[in-house]
Design a protein with these regions (language model features):
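A conserved amphipathic helix/loop scaffold
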Residues: 227-390
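Short, well-ordered secondary-structure micro-motifs within conserved domains or adaptor modules
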Residues: 28, 217-230
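Hydrophobic, well-ordered secondary-structure elements that form the walls
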Residues: 167, 208, 223, 317, ...
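A short, well-structured beta->alpha microelement
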Residues: 197-218
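Cofactor-binding loop segments of dinucleotide-utilizing enzymes, especially the Rossmann-like FAD-
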Residues: 119, 172, 213, 245, ...
């Protein structure tokens, strides 16, 4: 018997990967950090310029964590970018060290295998401009030495295992379909909402498990469920942060009788919603803002966050928190700071280019920046990787 493996892609919500993954022995995906930065991450030009040769610092990790949840934890990188590709709007070469970093990041997130696409750059046909580990003349391309370095390092490395993360993040394909059908704003995108939350968690130094809405919140210090179309009654038993748009529709995409959010235990109703253009964010009292989306609330629950104008921005009843808008990065961080002590989370304030991944036994640090960075007495060069025993 041989295992059945299939490869997924980045930012694709056209089918439910959990359902397909349940029929596979191993899920895999195609990781093209630089190509994805320019054609699907949604980064502005400043970020694209800064990460042009490295890729977005969270996009690969997001998909590692997502696809780890689709086949009982078994996953590969089926295609890893080794150099310039042939299909992105522009196709730069990686910063030296990045092919090694991308591979180590995948292994730190639990990958069993990292395969490069491709072995040799073909001198013919439609992909002849797609780099490989070998040039068309069969001589080594720049990434070959880095792949060999990773192989040598792996041979000496201990088995680090995959630890349960302290926080969970719900990703739900039905919600993606629903908000694609009814965005109510030109830039309301479910993937982007969840990804913004993920980025905020990673900037705080947290490892994340991405899971379907069947997650057991009692297994995590906090479970985040932004934009979740319907909120099952089972989503309780631990601290949960839901919203915006969570529980706002039925499975038939109708407004619940009595209005949303249809979340067990909450005494809060959304009376109307408004989508916000990029030039009109709504400031939060104390810092941060809602962008793209805001909901007006009637509530008998405790208000834990206000808009600058005084209206409720987030409410809480017991272990359920509902946030009535799409927070910017500062807004997400304020919410995390508010909850961290009760949840028993130790938060960091990582430099923009630095990311941390914790395994059973080790901490892995990754510098996605084009320059060296120092944090907590650790200095990583550009495209640097560092690991230490916990």
């Amino acid at each position: 018997d041989r295992p059945i493996i299939h490869n997924f892609m980045g930012r694709i919500t056209a089918f439910d990967h959990y359902n397909l993954g349940a029929d596979l022995d191993i899920s895999s995906w195609d990781s093209y950090p630089m190509g994805f930065l320019l054609d699907r991450v949604g980064a502005d030009e400043t970020a694209q310029a800064h990460y042009l040769r490295q890729g977005d610092p969270d996009f690969q990790a997001f998909h590692h964590d997502l696809y780890r949840a689709t086949s009982a934890g078994r996953w590969w990188v089926m295609e890893q970018q080794p150099g310039p590709v042939n299909w992105a709007p522009w196709n730069p070469a990686p910063l030296p060290g990045m092919p090694r970093l991308w591979a180590w990041e995948a292994f730190a997130h639990g990958a069993e295998t990292v395969c490069y696409f491709r072995w040799r750059q073909a001198p013919f046909a439609q992909e002849q401009m797609h780099a490989g580990l070998l040039r068309p003349d069969r001589s080594p391309a720049p990434a070959l030495a880095e792949a060999a370095q990773v192989a040598a390092e792996l041979a000496e490395a201990p088995d680090v295992g995959t630890a349960r993360a302290p926080v969970a993040l719900v990703f739900d394909y039905d919600s993606a379909y629903a908000w694609e059908s009814q965005p109510q704003g030109a830039d309301f995108d479910y993937f982007q909402l969840v990804f913004d939350c993920y980025r905020a968690l990673r900037r705080a130094g947290l490892s994340v498990d991405i899971l379907p809405k069947t997650v057991d919140p009692s297994a995590y210090k906090i479970t985040f469920a932004p934009g979740l179309l319907t909120v099952p009654e089972s989503l309780q038993g631990g601290l949960v942060v839901a919203g915006p748009r969570a529980g706002s529709k039925t499975e038939e995409l109708t407004i619940p009788e009595g209005l949303g959010p249809d979340i067990k235990g909450l005494s809060t109703k959304v009376t109307f919603v408004e989508s916000l253009p990029p030039f009109a964010p709504m400031a939060l009292e104390g810092g941060g803002a809602f962008m793209k989306w805001r909901e007006a609330l009637e509530t008998r629950d405790s208000v834990i966050l206000h808009l600058e104008e005084g209206a409720p921005a987030a409410v809480r009843k017991g272990q359920m928190i509902y946030i009535a808008g799409w927070p910017d990065a500062t807004g997400w961080r304020r919410l995390l700071d508010m909850l961290a002590e009760q949840a028993g989370l130790d938060l960091m304030d990582l430099p923009p280019d630095l990311r941390l991944r914790e395994t059973d036994s080790h901490r892995f640090w990754f510098n996605y920046g084009p320059r060296a960075v120092t944090y907590q007495n650790i200095t990583l060069p550009a495209a640097g990787v560092h690991w230490e025993v916990k």
